[in-house]
Amino acid sequence: MKTRIFIGSSKEGLEIAEYIKLQLGTKYECYLWTDDIFKFNESFLYTLLKEASLFDFGILVATKDDLSTIRDKSFDTPRDNVIFEFGLFLGRLGPSRAFVIQESGAKLPTDLLGITVPQFEKTIPLANSTSLNNEIERISKTIDEKITLGELGLLPSTVLAIGYFYNFVSIVCESIHTKSDIKVDDAIFKKFELNIVIPKDLDADIKKRATVYFKSKTLKEIQFETSSRNFPVFVTYDNQSKDVLKLYDMPTTLGGIDKAIEMFMRKGHIGKTSQQKLLEERELRNFQTTLQNLIDNDAFCRNIVKIIQEE
């Protein structure tokens, strides 16, 4: 599941948008406004509002498209729709995930004063524009930094990951560290590994999905005792060495993402659209990122918890 980026521009700035897509396309899943973004029988605004929620980042290219007179002075300005779309992505994704890259000399709205806006000099060919290539690289580094962080968004993946961590993962790990050993099937274990299985998608009831997965792996269900309550977990171990007890869990709380997406999309049909599936991918990715950050920052968890993908 690659990070998805929307790249917008005016028709006049499309060449630069295409160049940015070319540079970033090897690392991310990039879409131009010309890439079948707009659907038949939907208004431009409705499509934009919906599509903005499907992307992890937005990059808008502000080129010198129009000559505008402001208070008796003439300025080269970007096309109005580019600024509008930047504002839309800014509102949907937040200031750390929406970028506007400005051609030198293009006047931006005064509301953006005080914000550091990447600027570039347009050259022919574009590959010779040192400033453009430098700014693309800076944006790429910022994106790389942001995708390692879990952030609160319109849908609930971050909150669900936090709840799952503190209500299950950290409790189990603390119990593991406070016990001298755990007995399963007359075997005593002193080493442990907790595997969190992230489903490939949300196309089925997660509880049923987990049952099918654990059965396919011939895992044994046990009641894992902690200071607060007993948790049903699935385990396996090497029958010969009986060295490491491997525990498995699939977060059933992920079903809340599916319900939230249905409400957000105002679903009135059976089945899933491509847009619903893209939202699911984004939220699953953010759930995993948030959970991994919490694990890495917990002394009890970081050495025994692994996040794995459903096979």
UniProtKB/Swiss-Prot annotation:
InterPro entries: CAP12/PCTIR_TIR_dom (IPR019302), Prok_STING (IPR046876). Keywords: Antiviral defense, Hydrolase, Nucleotide-binding. Its EC number is 3.2.2.5. Forms homodimers; in the presence of c-di-GMP forms filaments with an ordered array of parallel-stacked subunits. This is CD-NTase-associated protein 12. Effector protein of a CBASS antiviral system with NAD(+) hydrolase activity. CBASS (cyclic oligonucleotide-based antiphage signaling system) provides immunity against bacteriophage. The CD-NTase protein synthesizes cyclic nucleotides in response to infection; these serve as specific second messenger signals. The signals activate a diverse range of effectors, leading to bacterial cell death and thus abortive phage infection. A type I-D CBASS(GG) system. Binds c-di-GMP, does not bind cUMP-AMP. Upon activation by c-di-GMP forms filaments which hydrolyze NAD(+); filament formation is required for enzyme activation. 3',3'-c-di-GMP binds at residues 168, 232, 249. In the C-terminal section; belongs to the bacterial STING family. It holds the Pfam family CAP12-PCTIR_TIR. The keyword Cell membrane does not apply. Residues 157-311 are annotated as: STING domain.
